[in-house]
Amino acid sequence: MAAPAPVTRQVSGAAALVPAPSGPDSGQPLAAAVAELPVLDARGQRVPFGALFRERRAVVVFVRHFLCYICKEYVEDLAKIPRSFLQEANVTLIVIGQSSYHHIEPFCKLTGYSHEIYVDPEREIYKRLGMKRGEEIASSGQSPHIKSNLLSGSLQSLWRAVTGPLFDFQGDPAQQGGTLILGPGNNIHFIHRDRNRLDHKPINSVLQLVGVQHVNFTNRPSVIHV
């Protein structure tokens, strides 16, 4: 399957109102062959990708790799989304990495993330969805979710690598991630492919697209009245 064209529409972190999902992939069904590809849970059990959003909508966030400090800090903010907010909108939040499944539990402990999480260690779903490899030079603006600078963040990642039980990058360091809104069934409502490590979607802009209340990520979770 040829990789679909990238979606270039961006939403700034300061946006108050976000248009309805659009782009060349939105409204098109996910190929059945992609939906059947397996992901692994924290126990190494295989689950068809499409089963994750068969019954309801899901925000699916593909991260670069579990040692990436940017991914770590982004997922730390995903962890702050109250489960009740997602339940009210009948939405599932899913993170997918591309490491061995053995790294899932330590990553969740590190970030405090307790929503659904899986891995695609062969990166087959990443490839079939057209996720990029390498860094595209593009201005992504200031992320509201990244707290560390390049030096301190890189040192943290290196320290985690050398002190971990297995010295590895917990995934391909050149792989980029992305965000999708999928389901129920194989419906694609929105897709964004990260052009570089800082090009992830501001979380509240994605939550607004699925009718989930905004979260104040500067402190503890709370509703933002707009």
Curated annotation (Swiss-Prot):
Pfam families: AhpC-TSA_2. InterPro entries: PXL2A/B/C, Thioredoxin-like_sf. Expressed in gastric tissues. Signal peptide: none annotated. GO terms for biological process: positive regulation of ERK1 and ERK2 cascade; positive regulation of glycolytic process. Gene3D superfamilies: Glutaredoxin. May positively regulate ERK1/2 signaling and AKT1 activation leading to HIF1A up-regulation with an increased expression of glycolysis genes and enhanced glycolysis. PANTHER family: PEROXIREDOXIN-LIKE 2C, PTHR28630. Belongs to the peroxiredoxin-like PRXL2 family. PRXL2C subfamily. This is Peroxiredoxin-like 2C.
